[in-house]
Amino acid sequence: MNKKTLKDIDVKGKRVFCRVDFNVPMKDGKVTDETRIRAAIPTIQYLVEQGAKVILASHLGRPKGEVVEELRLNAVAERLQALLGKDVAKADEAFGEEVKKTIDGMSEGDVLVLENVRFYPGEEKNDPELAKAFAELADVYVNDAFGAAHRAHASTEGIAQHIPAVAGFLMEKELDVLSKALSNPERPFTAIVGGAKVKDKIGVIDHLLDKVDNLIIGGGLSYTFIKALGHEVGKSLLEEDKIELAKSFMEKAKKNGVNFYMPVDVVVADDFSNDANIQVVSIEDIPSDWEGLDAGPKTREIYADVIKNSKLVIWNGPMGVFELDAFANGTKAVAEALAEATDTYSVIGGGDSAAAVEKFNLADKMSHISTGGGASLEFMEGKELPGVVALNDK
């Protein structure tokens, strides 16, 4: 990686403003999934051991520039304290005189969690004044929030204009894994692109068709491709305005010598619920008043076979409505094939795919689960991430 990282700087006795991604799911004031907090621990632990004054900043949810009581970071700070096994202080603001006083009173190795940075309208606007106010709290900036790296915000990009800025260990690992996968992949290289809408994955499909040996399509977006082949899709999700684009992707795959896999059979239902009547049909025979909600058994077998014969697989987006057990088999089959393919390096691109491997208790069988859904998606589109560009070059 051509950006400076934590190991390139001395942090002893320094005030370190570390941007982490603690945007975790909450319920009734409790953290329900602490994966993102755990992911930041190696960087925080290292800063503590090196004798830095550790100042942690994160967003939580979408408070839209105002204080929302249930989006305060108190519960997150409590979980962090338990995971770190040491005291973690929590500030009521994210900058200003009171926060400065608290930081002045910190000893080497102390940890302070600032208040939710999105309580301030300047954060998402990347307001230079707010970026400066953040920078005044510290001597060094560390960005370990890969999940927010695709945002040019005051705490992810603006602050880096004012003080030395380096990548944390999680950021470094995410970038290393993804850039190695895209620039120097082991082959056969397979990408699995699922999810609901073609429009969200246009850039990814387009970019990956220049890189992969196999492209597997699944989920709601596959019905636009099925329609592009000339088949009726009943009440399935369909983007009429993307049919021509779907055709052009299939042509590009052919031109580039990419094996293009899409469903051959699907699970259709007469209602969007677990109790619906369901049947398996070939893609030529989708009934007019039913909707496709999952990949069928033949499709699952073909996809699993492609996965097991790949050296590298990147997976972004589920194969069906996996939140409903009746339509989870396609997504589960992909997750299980990846878990069983021990010679395959598997990269799970955050978001729903990460949630799926968690749901099926297969997370520990994946080689790398990205902590950033949107960020990994943009990286796979070949876009530069503002939070990374802003860091100091080696």
UniProtKB/Swiss-Prot annotation:
The keyword ATP-binding applies. CDD domains: Phosphoglycerate_kinase. ATP binds at residues 201, 292, 323, 350-353. It is an enzyme of class 2 (transferase). It catalyses: (2R)-3-phosphoglycerate + ATP = (2R)-3-phospho-glyceroyl phosphate + ADP. Substrate binds at residues 21-23, 36, 59-62, 118, 151. The keyword Cytoplasm applies. PANTHER family: PHOSPHOGLYCERATE KINASE, PHOSPHOGLYCERATE KINASE 1, CHLOROPLASTIC-RELATED. This is Phosphoglycerate kinase. It comes from Priestia megaterium (strain DSM 319 / IMG 1521). The lineage of its organism: Bacteria, Bacillati, Bacillota, Bacilli, Bacillales. The gene is pgk.
